[in-house]
C-alpha cells in the first residue's frame, strides 16, 4: 500500500477539525449571545407597527354550500386529444 504524504495528512486533519467545528457550531445555543436581539412575539411587533389585530376581521368560510366537482366537463373535455 502507498504511504500518505505529509500534505495528505494535513488535509485530512484539517477536514476533521473543520467538521468537528461546524458540528459543534450547529449545536451551540445563542440565547445569551450579546449580538442576538431579544425575542419579540408577533403581537408586540404588530403593536409597534401600530397595526391592531382587533380591527381586522377573520373571514372563514364555514358554510355548508360547497360543491365538489362533478367530473370532466363534457363541453370542454368531450373530444379525446389528438394522437401523434
Curated annotation (Swiss-Prot):
Presence of keyword Glycoprotein: yes
Signal peptide: 1-29
A GO CC term attached to the entry: extracellular region
Listed InterPro entries: CLAVATA3-CLE
General remark: Overexpression of CL13 in roots almost abolishes nodule formation when inoculated with Sinorhizobium species. Roots of plants silencing CLE12 and CLE13 exhibit increased number of nodules after infection with Sinorhizobium meliloti.
TM regions (residue ranges): none
Gene source species: Medicago truncatula (Barrel medic)
One record GO biological process: cell differentiation
Family: Belongs to the CLV3/ESR signal peptide family.
Annotated region described as Disordered, given as residue ranges: 57-84
Positions annotated as glycosylated: 72
Keywords: Developmental protein, Differentiation, Glycoprotein, Hydroxylation, Secreted, Signal
Protein name: CLAVATA3/ESR (CLE)-related protein 13
Modified residues (Hydroxyproline): 69, 72
